[in-house]
Amino acid sequence: MKKDQYFNLEVNLLNDDNIAGMMLELGAANALGVYVMLLLHLRTKENYEASCRPLPLKALAKRYDVDVDLIGRILREFDLFEVDEERQMFRAPYLDRVMKTLEEKWRINAENGKKGGRPRKTKKRAET
């Protein structure tokens, strides 16, 4: 799998109070589907941020057959995204966090690959 086609979706994501509030107010499947769609969209963008100008949001809504007002509500009402109104860009702290961990893992793997592969496991000595 290519590196640019992956990110971790944590099992306890549904335990987040903001996610739970969004699902309660907007309907669980619909709200969670749009949230994950936005995460996937951000994952493909440089620095994991995208435009929240009206035209790109309308295009996104049309592509995924979702109401543009629902996208706007999820972006702005549930503290799941950081929206920079001045730059008209948005990002997801969740995605930033999981990608930081994943990118660090990739960096370590690349360094180990240059050294000849996986680091050797240290043998535990038997305690006497």
Give a label for each model feature:
Residues 1-103:
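Positively charged, structured surface patches that bind polyanionic biopolymers
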Residues 95-125:
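Basic DNA-binding region of bZIP-type proteins
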